[in-house]
């Protein structure tokens, strides 16, 4: 098998346990199935028992399931659960389907679950692993850019509820993460852009130099230059691994990774799961957070314009859908960062420096929300929906 153009090995350190992130390419090709560097060969050392359940979806299964399943069957008893594709299926019904396969196979605590897919599959597989028999091992094989740079690392797992995104879940760290850059070649352009939103997020909250790097390299990333994409994934995983090592369960600094998410989750919940991709909602949410940062006096208008330009360079939306101000405030009022009844937001002190704060005039938040609001007193969606 040819030497990959890009390869990196990282380690995530947590109080639960340490685990590797392997960033590489071409592990799922037909020629790679029998090779030591194949997808199956990479994950096999992290399977403790003899039982394996691969959880994937209807989009990914035809592309990569054979390359993973066929070699593993030589060593392990392998079952597969193929779920529908989409955020709208990130719910208890899908979790029950995973449980059903585990129970029908008479699998026990020796089982290892493998998430083969994007963030939805990873979140549901991880939550199933956290809850089945009070906890079994699982492995992440993220196949989208968003999941490679963010959701597969750090142990956040869960499902949505009709009244809120990620309302039900657990912190449950994987045994390893295998990010194959080649899987991005089959990713729709819209999904690639959604993943780039999370990449841009890291630059905005942690590293202004990385923002400059992205401004120069986003065209190559959009053109699927795997070496450039691999470098971006590596950097993002390094940023996240560092934060997770400091704050595994999001009691402090890890909250900074939610930049744009409070606004973004309002969009996702209001518009219906799946209508806006997570990264698209986060992109529009980051613009709103930047606009509030400007109103406070932390960012200049030129810096906000720069945020918008880099998002547009990635073909991302910079304007949220029209949502009544009170609806948005109701949704934000149930955010997990709310403390003593006050909304706390991740805002930018400068490009590359973020802070969790409630030190802002509520009228300024209302002003930001009003810029794109439905001008109505009430909205049918202004229920007690919860955003996590």
From Swiss-Prot:
It is found in: Cytoplasm. Pathway: Metabolic intermediate biosynthesis; chorismate biosynthesis; chorismate from D-erythrose 4-phosphate and phosphoenolpyruvate: step 2/7. Its cofactor is Co(2+); Zn(2+); NAD(+). Zn(2+) binds at residues 198, 261, 278. Disulfide bonds: none annotated. It comes from Psychrobacter arcticus (strain DSM 17307 / VKM B-2377 / 273-4). The keyword Lyase applies. CDD domains: DHQS. HAMAP family: DHQ_synthase (MF_00110). SUPFAM superfamilies: Dehydroquinate synthase-like (SSF56796). Belongs to the sugar phosphate cyclases superfamily. Dehydroquinate synthase family. It catalyses: 7-phospho-2-dehydro-3-deoxy-D-arabino-heptonate = 3-dehydroquinate + phosphate. InterPro entries: Dehydroquinate_synthase, DHQ_synth_AroB, DHQ_synth_fam, DHQS/DOIS_N, DHQS_C. GO terms for molecular function: 3-dehydroquinate synthase activity; metal ion binding; nucleotide binding. One of its GO terms (biological process) is aromatic amino acid family biosynthetic process. NAD(+) binds at residues 85-90, 119-123, 143-144, 156, 165, 183-186. Keywords: Amino-acid biosynthesis, Aromatic amino acid biosynthesis, Cobalt, Cytoplasm, Lyase, Metal-binding, NAD, Nucleotide-binding, Zinc. This is 3-dehydroquinate synthase. Gene3D superfamilies: 3.40.50.1970, Dehydroquinate synthase-like - alpha domain. GO terms for cellular component: cytoplasm. Its main location: cytoplasm. Catalyzes the conversion of 3-deoxy-D-arabino-heptulosonate 7-phosphate (DAHP) to dehydroquinate (DHQ). PANTHER family: 3-DEHYDROQUINATE SYNTHASE, 3-DEHYDROQUINATE SYNTHASE, CHLOROPLASTIC. Binds 1 divalent metal cation per subunit. Can use either Co(2+) or Zn(2+). It is an enzyme of class 4 (lyase). Its EC number is 4.2.3.4.
């Amino acid at each position: 098998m040819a030497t990959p153009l890009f390869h990196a090995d990282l380690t995530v350190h947590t109080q639960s346990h340490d685990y590797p992130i392997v960033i590489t390419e071409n592990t799922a090709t037909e020629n790679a199935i029998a090779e030591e560097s194949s997808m199956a060969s990479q994950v096999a050392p992290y399977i403790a028992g003899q039982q394996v359940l691969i959880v994937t979806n209807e989009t990914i299964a035809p592309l990569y399931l054979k390359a993973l399943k066929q070699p593993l069957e030589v060593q392990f008893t392998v079952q597969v659960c193929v779920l529908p594709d989409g955020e709208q299926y990130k719910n208890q019904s899908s979790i029950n389907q995973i449980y059903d396969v585990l129970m029908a196979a008479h699998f026990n605590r020796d089982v290892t679950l493998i998430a083969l897919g994007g963030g939805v599959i990873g979140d549901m597989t991880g939550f199933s692993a956290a809850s089945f028999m009070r906890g079994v091992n699982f492995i992440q094989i993220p196949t989208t850019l968003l999941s490679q740079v963010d959701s597969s690392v750090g142990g956040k797992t869960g499902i949505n509820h009709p009244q809120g995104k990620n309302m039900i879940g657990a912190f449950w760290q994987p045994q390893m993460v295998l990010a194959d850059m080649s899987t991005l070649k089959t990713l729709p352009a819209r999904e690639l852009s959604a993943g780039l939103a999370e990449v841009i997020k890291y630059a905005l909250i942690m590293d202004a130099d990385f923002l400059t790097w992205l401004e120069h390299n986003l065209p190559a990333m959009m053109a699927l230059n795997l070496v450039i994409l691999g470098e971006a994934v590596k950097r993002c995983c390094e940023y996240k691994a560092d934060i997770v090592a400091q704050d595994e369960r999001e009691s402090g600094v890890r909250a900074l990774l939610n930049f744009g998410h409070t606004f973004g989750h309002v969009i996702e919940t209001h518009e219906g799961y799946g209508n806006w991709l997570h990264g698209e909602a986060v992109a529009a949410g980051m613009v709103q957070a930047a606009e509030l940062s400007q109103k406070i006096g932390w960012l200049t208008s030129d810096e906000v314009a720069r945020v918008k330009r880099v998002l547009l360079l990635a073909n991302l939306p910079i304007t949220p859908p029209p949502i009544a101000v009170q609806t948005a405030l109701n949704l934000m009022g149930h955010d997990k960062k709310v403390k003593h009844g006050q909304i706390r937001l991740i805002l930018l002190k400068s490009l590359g420096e973020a802070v969790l704060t409630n030190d802002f005039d509520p009228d300024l938040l209302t002003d930001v929300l009003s810029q794109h609001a439905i001008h109505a007193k009430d909205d049918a969606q202004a229920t007690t929906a919860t955003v996590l």
